[in-house]
Amino acid sequence: MAESNFVDYVKIYCRSGKGGRGSAHMRREKYVPNGGPDGGDGGRGGHVILRGNRNYWTLLHLKYDRHVFATHGGNGSKNKSFGKDGEDKVIEVPCGTVVYNAETGEYICDITEHGQEIILLKGGRGGLGNWHFRTATRQAPRFAQPGEPMQELMVILELKLLADVGLVGFPNAGKSTLLSTVSAARPKIANYPFTTLEPNLGIVSYREGKSFVMADIPGIIEGASEGKGLGLRFLRHIERNSLLLFMVPGDTDDIRKEYEILLNELATFNPEMLDKQRVLAITKSDMLDEELIAMLEPTLPDNVPHIFISSVTGLGIQQLKDILWTELNKDSNKLEGVRTETIVHRAKDVAKLQEELKDMGEDEDFEYEYEEDADDDFDYEYEDENWDEEEEKK
């Protein structure tokens, strides 16, 4: 089976740079026998930075490059020369990426906008040179500060796709067919369940050049919230959606019951998903005549807008777009302006997280060695502990 290009989980090891050490150099020039201290400060270690990039929509580019190292700051030198700052390491991620501590499961941050930057690990501050420590009674300090140590962290990046409308339904409900009908997306379509194995996004064109984004996820089956089928892994991709479009085939024995099963699975996975706007689409309605549609109307849920559609004949497609646009632009669900649905992030269960990574082949042990250098064995003296005060004055 070919490996999927859609990667929404990745585990990476990050390490910031350590600060360069300050110089304890004493000025020595011809005709200047007592030049005094002139050691410069060490440079700052490089940060590890996360940056949102709308040109990415999966984490595939990080799957095979999972060791992220920023560079160390340079050491201070004579003539109050400051060390060079370490180079920051920027990790480009798709908008909608959530970051967790891989060891504790603790939520760290969330990237939701293009160009948004968050410092994941700060580089160590550079050590102060000896000229900072000169006083009236200590005019030739022969010591300096070392740089602050680096930081390291194992993190898990989890992608939750950003879309306005999320399609929810059982396998073979016609979700992919609808997406291919209303957008330029071309998901795989076939007459058997679980044709869709990964999420798909499509931009739906509306009137007067307006548009909205629709997300199709693999079909949900009863018990998906307990780990059955593919639905559980991909349910998180509709957590950010402003509106959920439930799709139930018209030839189903009990449309209301199937809708309630889907609703229950979402509630079990995340109760907050029930607060989202909902629309019910009865698909494959080209197989229903007007008399049968009239008989089904009284049996449909009362608390949700519904419409009969057919992606094959185009029945009700434009009306569906109108309903979706109206619901998206309600005061409680404004589409224009802020398009990102705010969600509450909770700490992850580490055991479940590791199990899911194992199922995806992402549980390999990371082997990395700390490279020692001359600074690690350097013997520093400390006679001034006012690190923060001195650093703030710079």
Swiss-Prot record:
Residues 163-329 form the OBG-type G domain. Residues 4-162 form the Obg domain. It comes from the Bacteria. GO terms for cellular component: cytoplasm. PROSITE patterns: G_OBG, GTP1_OBG, OBG. Monomer. An essential GTPase which binds GTP, GDP and possibly (p)ppGpp with moderate affinity, with high nucleotide exchange rates and a fairly low GTP hydrolysis rate. Plays a role in control of the cell cycle, stress response, ribosome biogenesis and in those bacteria that undergo differentiation, in morphogenesis control. This is GTPase Obg.
